[in-house]
Amino acid sequence: MSLVFIIMAIAGYLVGAIPMAYLLSRWRRGIDIRRYGSGNVGASNVVKTAGKRLGLAVFIFDVSKGAVMILLSGALGLALWQQIVVGLFTIAGHNWPVFLRFNGGRGIATSLGVALVMAPVPALIALGTAIAFGLFKKMAPGVFLGVAALPFMSGYFHGFFGIREYQTISWGFIGIFLIMVTRRLMAPDNEYAHTVSKAELIFNRMFLDRDIRSRSVWINRNSAPAEESPNIL
């Protein structure tokens, strides 16, 4: 195991751990995003609590974290499996950032950045699936299905998509899926977690990315302050 690989894995975690959603919300709105909206430290909650422009800035940054770390690892001569591990460390850093006491976002945008470099076409199909579901306000199930489909797309349709080293890519996608599911299931407990059965809670968290079925109740349970600061963009 090379020193460069170890350094890049650690760097990936630290870069991933930069909580841009938290930082920009603090700077531009003066709020702790973990206390408002869904409580998620990610672009979607920034859109809800701080506006679309700020949310777009966070989304671009989070996607770039994953993509840049994979590309840099490749430029340094790391093997494909090592590049993927660096990408997974970057996603883990976003989800469990040391700077926020290991309570971060869901890592979807960062995972997209990693996936776009690993296998662009399947990643775009997964993104399209999430967007299609999002049009009907079902983004979380769309993300779940899109990410779950990635290993199958790379494994069974690698020839069609022109994916080399597809077995390694498929294992990388499985890693992304497992990290996503683990993060959803490890969401902090709240008052709603005790209003449903254990089985329903697991289903809701894993598939819907919330503790209860009602999306509107979930995302509006903590409203952001009314006062607005000037937009960053």
UniProtKB/Swiss-Prot annotation:
UniProt keyword annotation of Chaperone present: no
Protein task: Catalyzes the transfer of an acyl group from acyl-phosphate (acyl-PO(4)) to glycerol-3-phosphate (G3P) to form lysophosphatidic acid (LPA). This enzyme utilizes acyl-phosphate as fatty acyl donor, but not acyl-CoA or acyl-ACP.
Membrane-traversing stretches: 3-23, 69-89, 116-136, 143-163, 168-188
EC number: 2.3.1.275
Keywords, in A-Z order: Cell membrane, Lipid biosynthesis, Lipid metabolism, Membrane, Phospholipid biosynthesis, Phospholipid metabolism, Transferase, Transmembrane, Transmembrane helix
The family this protein is said to belong to: Belongs to the PlsY family.
Entry membrane topology: Multi-pass membrane protein
Main location group: membrane
Catalyzed reactions: an acyl phosphate + sn-glycerol 3-phosphate = a 1-acyl-sn-glycero-3-phosphate + phosphate
GO CC terms in record: plasma membrane
A family per Pfam: G3P_acyltransf
The protein's name in its UniProt record: Glycerol-3-phosphate acyltransferase 5
Molecular functions (GO terms): acyl-phosphate glycerol-3-phosphate acyltransferase activity
Broad enzyme group: transferase
Subunit structure: Probably interacts with PlsX.
Species of provenance: Dehalococcoides mccartyi (strain ATCC BAA-2266 / KCTC 15142 / 195) (Dehalococcoides ethenogenes (strain 195))
Locations listed in the record: Cell membrane
